[in-house]
UniProtKB/Swiss-Prot annotation:
Belongs to the tubulin family. It catalyses: GTP + H2O = GDP + phosphate + H(+). Its cofactor is Mg(2+). This is Tubulin alpha chain.
């Protein structure tokens, strides 16, 4: 079978994972103690479990996941929370002192003591898989553990499991709402380290998701749980085709083949529709056409950037629920007639479709309305370079004065790493510019004839 191991690093990673496992359990009919619900037992056997869960001899399902954090608080909440019976206690690994928002602590000093223990557990989970497909790594860019330890883990996974795909879900620092001053440092250092190790990185930024929750769900003050439940829907959609059947199934390697034109340009933009509150759901038709269109509106995208300023290189549309291929093709045909959505000229077709028949599930008493179909869009667009340039300029402001650098150097980092990471990111921005520019030159040539 095609198993996936989820690795959750730091506070953001662990809290997103909580929402994800809550959702997977609902989708597969697994109770918080790991045993099946009565109606699930009565239904046809479900073979999709094994992607995310391993079955023990007595019919209990255990998630194939590892929680790792350098401080115990967040993981202790899981250990005492509603799902404490679900997870394997040895797969919850927490240290004693946190990384204090410092990449160097997560990557060099504190993280170094925990990494072997984590990799040992990863090895045990991996040995339990018959056909491991790859890893999903959840972490934030801004925190110390997420950035430092996350990067260290990615490096070591490349050494131990070179050929397996590694997909990242990264919480990118929001442009306006920062949780720490040194986020730009941590983000650029971790991007530089993981750039060559990740096959595909799905970025989400808190501010964009806050706005989606406020606008579409009518929540005045969304909390992290609201945000994470929305992210969980996206993660679930991306992996749904591995777990349920459908007419167009997509596996992890297929994403990379279709979304990543060059190894470094692997940061797709994520959008999800419909995000709608229960009060409004009854008034919406929620047709395939509408859902597909709303994915291309900047308001529904999970990183603050404007795709109308960039060009699309490739787009994956993953439908769930009551969708027939004919409707999906019609929706895409309509999209292609719109002038607002521009593709680079070296990639004329550009759409990859996936359809999975399992309708989306919602958490009971959650904010999202129950809908019979949904779509998740992953698109590789040159507009995401806006996010990088915003981050780089913040980095430059601080680094020009060498502000806060002593904290990193004090933990054994070299100052040269900062400039090296910054140059790497500048190169990444240039890569994006060149991809967009290639198509510009083509247009000028055509105009002359």
């Amino acid at each position: 079978m095609r198993e996936i191991i989820s690795l959750n690093v730091g506070q953001a990673g662990c809290q997103i994972a909580n929402s994800c496992w809550e959702l997977y359990c609902l989708e597969h009919g697994i109770q918080p103690d790991g045993y099946l619900t009565e109606e699930r037992k009565a239904a046809d056997p479900d073979h999709g479990f094994s992607t995310f869960f391993s079955e023990t001899g007595n019919g209990k399902y255990v998630p194939r996941t590892i929680y790792a954090d350098l401080e115990p608080n967040v993981i202790d909440e899981v250990r005492t929370g509603a799902y404490r019976g679900l997870f394997h206690p040895e797969h919850m690994i927490s240290g004693k002192e946190d990384a204090s928002n410092n990449y160097a602590r997560g990557h060099y000093t504190v993280g170094k003591e925990l990494i072997d223990q984590v990799l040992d557990k990863v090895r045990r989970v991996a040995d339990n898989c018959s056909g491991l497909q790859g890893f999903l790594v959840f972490h934030s860019f801004g925190g110390g553990t997420g950035s430092g330890f996350g990067a260290l883990l990615m490096e070591r996974l490349s050494v131990d499991y070179g050929k397996k795909s590694k997909l990242e879900f990264c919480v990118y620092p929001a442009p306006q709402t920062a949780t720490s001053v040194v986020e730009p440092y941590n983000s650029i250092l971790t991007t530089h380290t993981t750039l060559e190790h990740a096959d595909c990185s799905f970025m989400v930024d808190n501010e964009a998701i806050y706005d989606i929750c406020r606008r579409n769900l009518g929540l005045e003050r969304p909390n992290y749980e609201n945000l994470n439940r929305l992210i969980a829907q996206v993660v679930s959609s991306i992996t749904a085709s591995l777990r349920f059947d459908g007419s167009l199934n997509v596996d992890l390697n297929e994403f990379q083949t279709n979304l990543v034109p060059y190894p470094r340009i692997h940061f797709p933009l994520v959008a999800y529709a419909p995000v709608i509150s229960a009060a409004k759901a009854a008034h919406e038709a929620n047709s395939v056409q509408e859902m597909t269109m709303s994915c291309f509106e900047p308001n529904n995208q999970m990183v603050k950037c404007d795709p109308r300023h960039g060009k699309y290189m490739a787009t994956c549309l993953l439908y769930r629920g009551d969708v027939v291929p004919n409707d999906a093709h019609a929706a895409v045909a309509t999209l292609k007639t719109k002038r607002t959505i521009q593709f680079v000229d070296w990639c004329p077709t550009g759409f990859k479709l996936g359809i999975c028949y399992q309708p989306p599930h919602q958490v009971p008493n959650g904010d999202l309305a129950k809908v019979n179909r949904a779509v998740c869009m992953l698109s590789n667009t040159t507009a995401i370079a806006e996010a990088w340039s915003a981050l780089s300029s913040k980095f430059d402001l601080m680094y020009s004065k060498r502000a806060f650098v002593h904290w990193y150097v004090g933990e054994g980092m070299e100052e040269g790493e900062f400039s090296e990471a910054r140059e790497d990111l500048a190169a990444l921005e240039r890569d994006y510019e060149e991809v967009a520019a290639d198509s510009m030159e083509g247009e000028e040539v055509e105009a002359e004839y």
